[in-house]
């Protein structure tokens, strides 16, 4: 019975992540999101979003011709946003792969 406890804990975390991603988080999933893996994942997604918003804001400022905004700064910020987004996609892919492996484990 003790070997199932870690697996059940991981499944509960994945369910909490799925509910959070769907926007239907329950009160039980809220404590899990504040710390641990789920919390770190949420903070990472927030950082990716902030990087993209900063890059697109700088891009818009350049397009409007605001002084002090150079093209090379815009390109660097856009590449940073792209790299962070691609990293997030790879983390998601690994998470889905791990979930599928756990679901295919014999009990």
Swiss-Prot record:
Pfam families cross-referenced by the UniProt entry: FliE
InterPro entries cross-referenced by the UniProt entry: FliE
Gene Ontology terms describing biological process: bacterial-type flagellum-dependent cell motility
Localisation per UniProt entry: Bacterial flagellum basal body
Family the entry assigns: Belongs to the FliE family.
Molecular function as annotated in GO: cytoskeletal motor activity; structural molecule activity
Record's keyword terms, sorted: Bacterial flagellum
GO cellular component annotations of the record: bacterial-type flagellum basal body
Protein name listed in UniProt: Flagellar hook-basal body complex protein FliE
Signal peptide extent: none
Organism lineage: Bacteria, Pseudomonadati, Pseudomonadota, Betaproteobacteria, Burkholderiales
Key word Calcium present: no
